[in-house]
Design a protein with these regions (language model features):
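Short, solvent-exposed loop/turn segments at secondary-structure boundaries
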Residues: 78-80, 164-167
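A mid-sequence, solvent-exposed acidic-amphipathic segment
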Residues: 136-143, 150-162
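N-terminal export/targeting leaders of redox proteins
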Residues: 1-52, 56-60, 64, 73-82, ...
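Flexible coil segments in periplasmic/lumen-exposed cytochrome c-class electron-transfer proteins
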Residues: 98-138, 145-149, 169-176, 180-233
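The canonical Cys-X-X-Cys-His
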Residues: 63-72, 84-94, 150-157, 174-181, ...
Length: 233
């Protein structure tokens, strides 16, 4: 049988094909690096808010529980942004006679002017969302915190932040890594909002973190799924 030979005019195309292949590899590598770069994933994103609210003071120094402001986190898919009324509980403005209806913590502070304006007009403060997942991603706060996933697992040490920033990458790979091995991220439910609580200095029921997590996962049937429909509904 006679062998098939490519015509000579094909030879230059081999070089073009090689260059195109190399360019494709470089492009794929560059895109892979770009989409996994912390800047692309918004790690460190720290927007200026209309009110300079300090979590370091409120959650850190004053030890306010996360649920005082984000009061739906254990019951709902979304952690509520606190209404102005929550702020007014402590920062009640003074009336014309200088009398405050509730607690008078810095009632005339210029930094709290947007809060007082919001209270008087009934218009919500225009907070800027920091942890902003894509619209095609479903995330349920209640499911996670009720299972024993602490706020700091996803948000970092909020209680040490003067201005809140995105501390974790919140990428699909990052989420899946936890779903595949949730044990190291679990703690007793009563310590979920205690951001300074740590297994390194604590034991629960005489067990270390690894032993407790294994028992907890069996008792509460924690077996996170990783198929697409779990988060993309």
């Amino acid at each position: 049988m006679q062998r098939f030979l490519f015509p000579r005019w094909v030879n230059p195309l081999l070089g073009v094909f090689a260059v195109a292949t190399a360019a494709g590899v470089v492009f794929a590598g560059a895109m892979g690096g770009l989409i996994t770069d912390p800047k692309t994933l918004n790690v460190g994103y720290e927007p200026i808010q209309p009110v300079p609210f300090s979590h370091a003071i409120h959650a850190g120094q004053l030890k306010l529980d996360c649920r005082y402001c984000h009061n739906t986190v254990f019951e709902a898919a979304h952690a509520a942004v606190p209404p102005t009324a929550t702020c007014i509980n402590c920062h009640s403005p003074a009336n014309d006679q200088g009398v405050t209806a509730l607690a008078a913590v810095h009632p005339t502070s210029a930094k709290l002017a947007p809060i007082r304006e919001s209270w008087q007009t009934g218009r919500s403060v225009a907070w800027t969302r920091v942890h902003n997942l894509p619209s095609f991603v479903y995330f349920n706060h209640a499911a996670h915190v009720n299972s024993g996933v602490s706020c700091k697992t996803c948000h970092g040490r909020i209680d040490q932040m003067e201005t809140v920033y995105q501390a974790k990458e919140l990428s699909m790979a990052w989420c899946i890594s936890c779903h595949r091995n949730p044990g190291p991220h679990l703690r007793p439910k009563e310590h979920v909002t205690h951001l300074d609580w740590d297994w390194d200095t604590s034991e629960v029921e005489g067990k270390d973190q690894e032993t407790w997590a294994k028992d907890h996962m069996l008792e509460t049937n924690i077996n996170p799924l990783v198929n697409c429909a779990v988060c993309h509904r």
